């Protein structure tokens, strides 16, 4: 029984030494790679910024909830103005443009001639004013009701 405990203690000591060596070599690699990162680039993707403050995920300028740039395109953001999720002009929730098309979704601007993925949930006299956000949402059949 004592020999098993001694063997386990020896294995633990070897594991501890190996992990310390790996951590030390990882620290030197990280310090070398930090020199190549520009200080103004922060966040998810490229072109500066972060989740809630400038830049964007895969575009440039703007962010998730702020302004300028967007997820995959340019100009605007997820909930703020200008641009949209995949394109340009308008935004996801607030007027002008739309999620993947043109002309507005969830807050003004009309549908711009493109379709609503889950149907139209509010139809005005000039066509669809608000697309459904999920398939089970109630669909309005009469304009203005």
UniProtKB/Swiss-Prot annotation:
<feature type="compositionally biased region" description="Basic and acidic residues">
    <location>
        <begin position="32"/>
        <end position="43"/>
    </location>
</feature>
<dbReference type="GO" id="GO:0009737">
    <property type="term" value="P:response to abscisic acid"/>
</dbReference>
<keyword id="KW-0964">Secreted</keyword>
<dbReference type="GO" id="GO:0008361">
    <property type="term" value="P:regulation of cell size"/>
</dbReference>
<keyword id="KW-0732">Signal</keyword>
<keyword id="KW-0272">Extracellular matrix</keyword>
<comment type="function">
    <text>Regulates the function of the receptor protein kinase WAK1, and namely the phosphorylation of OEE2.</text>
</comment>
<comment type="similarity">
    <text>Belongs to the GRP family.</text>
</comment>
<dbReference type="GO" id="GO:0009751">
    <property type="term" value="P:response to salicylic acid"/>
</dbReference>
<dbReference type="InterPro" id="IPR010800">
    <property type="entry name" value="GRP"/>
</dbReference>
<dbReference type="GO" id="GO:0010044">
    <property type="term" value="P:response to aluminum ion"/>
</dbReference>
<dbReference type="InterPro" id="IPR053373">
    <property type="entry name" value="GRP_receptor_kinase_reg"/>
</dbReference>
<feature type="repeat" description="4">
    <location>
        <begin position="80"/>
        <end position="86"/>
    </location>
</feature>
<feature type="repeat" description="1">
    <location>
        <begin position="59"/>
        <end position="65"/>
    </location>
</feature>
<dbReference type="GO" id="GO:0009826">
    <property type="term" value="P:unidimensional cell growth"/>
</dbReference>
<dbReference type="GO" id="GO:0009269">
    <property type="term" value="P:response to desiccation"/>
</dbReference>
<feature type="repeat" description="5">
    <location>
        <begin position="87"/>
        <end position="93"/>
    </location>
</feature>
<feature type="repeat" description="3">
    <location>
        <begin position="73"/>
        <end position="79"/>
    </location>
</feature>
<dbReference type="GO" id="GO:0048364">
    <property type="term" value="P:root development"/>
</dbReference>
<protein>
    <recommendedName>
        <fullName>Glycine-rich protein 3</fullName>
    </recommendedName>
</protein>
<feature type="repeat" description="2">
    <location>
        <begin position="66"/>
        <end position="72"/>
    </location>
</feature>
<comment type="subunit">
    <text>Interacts (via Cys-rich C-terminus) with WAK1 (via the extracellular domain). Component of a 500 kDa complex, composed of GRP3 or GRP3-S, WAK1 and KAPP.</text>
</comment>
<dbReference type="Pfam" id="PF07172">
    <property type="entry name" value="GRP"/>
</dbReference>
<dbReference type="GO" id="GO:0009723">
    <property type="term" value="P:response to ethylene"/>
</dbReference>
<feature type="repeat" description="6">
    <location>
        <begin position="94"/>
        <end position="100"/>
    </location>
</feature>
<feature type="region of interest" description="6 X 7 AA tandem repeats of G-G-G-G-[NR]-Y-Q">
    <location>
        <begin position="37"/>
        <end position="113"/>
    </location>
</feature>
<dbReference type="GO" id="GO:0005576">
    <property type="term" value="C:extracellular region"/>
</dbReference>
<feature type="region of interest" description="Disordered">
    <location>
        <begin position="28"/>
        <end position="51"/>
    </location>
</feature>
<feature type="signal peptide">
    <location>
        <begin position="1"/>
        <end position="23"/>
    </location>
</feature>
<dbReference type="GO" id="GO:0005739">
    <property type="term" value="C:mitochondrion"/>
</dbReference>
<keyword id="KW-0677">Repeat</keyword>
């Amino acid at each position: 029984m004592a020999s098993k405990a001694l063997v386990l203690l020896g294995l633990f000591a070897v594991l501890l030494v190996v992990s310390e060596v790996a951590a030390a070599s990882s620290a030197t690699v990280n310090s070398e790679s930090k020199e190549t990162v520009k200080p103004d680039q922060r966040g998810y993707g490229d072109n500066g910024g972060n989740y809630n403050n400038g830049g964007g995920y895969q575009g440039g300028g703007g962010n998730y909830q702020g302004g300028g740039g967007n997820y995959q395109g340019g100009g605007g953001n997820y909930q703020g103005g200008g641009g949209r999720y995949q394109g340009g002009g308008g935004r996801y929730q607030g007027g002008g443009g739309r999620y993947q098309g043109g002309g507005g979704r969830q807050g003004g601007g009309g549908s711009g001639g493109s379709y609503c993925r889950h149907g139209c949930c509010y139809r005005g006299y000039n066509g669809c004013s608000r697309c459904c956000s999920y398939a089970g949402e109630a669909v309005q059949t009469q304009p203005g009701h």
